[in-house]
Regions:
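Polyanion-binding interface signature
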Residues: 8-148
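Phosphate/dinucleotide-binding and metal-coordinating scaffold of catalytic cores
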Residues: 5
Length: 148
């Protein structure tokens, strides 16, 4: 018994479409799952809001190392200074950005987004240069997911 041969086809399944939201959009992002982001025209895969937040800050910092160094040494009266420290033990949750520069990451998603807006303003970066790709079909399974 013989079967029909496979037909030649150029069909490719459509790529999954994600909701795109830029940093300058007025939308609450808490509870949304991020799968990737585009910063300065380059797309990056990501597993969490924390990862995106720290990678974007690293890129901003690499362009101008003076600002985060200033914040790390400033007193708490300086806006954003409570987000940056020289010691990883100062925060309950932090990520290393550079030598002796740590960013507080134990915050809610929307708080991170609001901080990015402030950092973009200080770095004179256009907020439309950061676009989030959201996949809400993943759903929210745990408290940890919500905080990410």
């Amino acid at each position: 018994m013989s079967l029909w041969p496979y037909a030649d086809s150029s069909y490719t399944p459509p790529q999954k479409q994600y909701e795109e939201v830029s940093l300058d959009d007025d939308i609450t992002l808490t509870g949304h799952s991020i799968v990737k982001y585009r910063f300065r025209g380059i797309e990056h895969e990501t597993t969490s809001w924390v990862e995106m937040y720290t990678e974007v800050l690293k890129e901003l910092h690499n362009g101008n190392k003076a600002y985060l160094n200033y914040l790390a040494d400033a007193d708490d009266s300086v806006d954003l200074s409570i987000q940056v420290t020289r010691s990883p033990d100062e925060f309950s949750s932090s990520v290393k950005i550079d030598d002796d520069i740590y960013i507080w990451t134990g915050t809610a998603t929307q708080y991170k987004v609001n901080l990015l807006r402030k950092f973009f303003e200080q770095y004179k970066q256009d907020p439309s240069d950061l676009v989030f790709f959201l996949d809400d079909s993943k759903g929210i399974g745990s408290d940890e997911e919500i905080e990410r």
